[in-house]
């Protein structure tokens, strides 16, 4: 990554800190101490700025590596994320195997937001990668969004929309694991900073699930770090 010019710390140190924060669910102050124990004196506010700048960039550059659905049966749901004391909505999709498909943070929970998320998730996929089944809860917003996307040719006409509660157990369990990373934050200040941080959390969750395993030459945590 050539974006570290004029930075006081080496790029490897910055990526090390960003990766640890996004993968292990530690607070910025705890990570400051962990870095200090390894001989790197850096303030927690500096680590915060690194995460805001580089977590979205890491997600962007690694997206091609991990965002390839292994199943055409998707589970779609949203979970709550607090921003400035108010709830926002993190739309998420995984396939039936639990692999992350995509995510989108929205200030609203309605058909427009659902459509924007599903359009984002479908964008760039080959025809054979697009879902044949999408399972959601019984919120009417998803039915509206899927119907509109079909009418616009952005969603397969033959796609089946299911609303079977137990089928979404896999994504509800995945929400819980993501929340373990979000919990130490104790509330985001803005939607922008929340989304930037969540991008880091989501890409590290995807890597941890083995979604880029084909690029992990050693098959272990060191190989994951090299990606």
Language-model features, listed with the residues they occupy:
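Active-site beta-loop-alpha junctions of metal-dependent nucleic acid enzymes
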Residues: 53, 103-127
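Short conserved beta-strand segments at catalytic cores or DNA/RNA-binding microdomains
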Residues: 84-100, 110, 118-122
């Amino acid at each position: 990554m050539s974006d570290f010019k004029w930075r006081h710390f080496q790029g490897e140190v910055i990526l090390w800190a960003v990766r640890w924060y996004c993968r292990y669910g530690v607070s910025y102050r705890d990570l400051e101490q962990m870095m200090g124990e390894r001989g790197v004196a850096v303030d927690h506010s500096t680590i915060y700025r690194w995460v805001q700048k580089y977590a979205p960039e890491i997600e962007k550059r690694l997206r091609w590596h991990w965002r390839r659905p292994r199943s055409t049966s998707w589970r779609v749901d949203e979970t709550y994320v607090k921003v400035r004391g108010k709830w926002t909505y993190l739309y998420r999709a995984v396939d039936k195997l639990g692999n992350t498909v995509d995510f989108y943070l929205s200030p609203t929970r309605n058909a427009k937001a659902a459509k924007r998320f599903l359009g984002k998730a479908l964008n760039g996929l080959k025809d054979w990668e697009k879902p044949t089944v999408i399972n959601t809860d019984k919120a009417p917003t998803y039915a509206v969004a899927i119907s509109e996307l079909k009418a616009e040719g952005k969603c397969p006409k033959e796609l089946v929309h299911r609303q079977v509660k137990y089928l979404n157990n896999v994504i509800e369990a995945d929400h819980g694991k993501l929340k373990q990373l979000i919990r130490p934050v104790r509330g985001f200040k803005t939607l922008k900073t929340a989304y930037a941080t969540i991008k880091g959390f989501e890409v590290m969750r995807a890597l941890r699930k083995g979604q880029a395993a084909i690029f992990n030459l050693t098959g272990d945590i060191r190989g994951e770090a090299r990606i």
